[in-house]
Amino acid sequence: MRLRFSVPLFFFGCVFVHGVFAGPFPPPGMSLPEYWGEEHVWWDGRAAFHGEVVRPACTLAMEDAWQIIDMGETPVRDLQNGFSGPERKFSLRLRNCEFNSQGGNLFSDSRIRVTFDGVRGETPDKFNLSGQAKGINLQIADVRGNIARAGKVMPAIPLTGNEEALDYTLRIVRNGKKLEAGNYFAVLGFRVDYE
């Protein structure tokens, strides 16, 4: 059985800028240049400005916009003798993160949540695989053992600095149906939300 898994990863985010200032003109204590003179200035207009200083979102550092994770070849007999087959690790690397800091490099109140999107498998904790292979699904787990569910937000991950590696394990698991040899693939997306 030849196993191949493709994961195109999509990153969504936005940066928002907004602020407020609307003081008198000229500000108290400031005089206009002498050559302006009151007779040359019309004082019947007003401009209001507003803005906000925000922390920008992290940037996603990937070698390629489409990560392809090769699960290798697995004999059917290996899957018949257990619940799961091969595992592969992959990471989502975030860089240039600017979050609330309480000194040093400790970013104590900034967290992110990741959501994986794809076609649900036979149970909510599995993703469907396409192709000729039958009887298997894909499962994603984070480093704490939390299992991803299609379209459901995973537990929050605290950020510890301006560069983060979000590590996950992909594994092929049985889905209760009859095993059949063949190729398989899946296309999954993900979303990162900041708190």
Swiss-Prot record:
The gene is papH. This is PAP fimbrial minor pilin protein. Belongs to the fimbrial protein family. InterPro entries: Adhesion_dom_fimbrial_sf (IPR036937), Adhesion_dom_sf (IPR008966), Bact_Fimbrial_Adh_Pro (IPR050263). Its main location: secreted. Residues 1-22 form the signal peptide. It comes from Escherichia coli. It comes from the Bacteria. GO terms for cellular component: extracellular region; pilus.
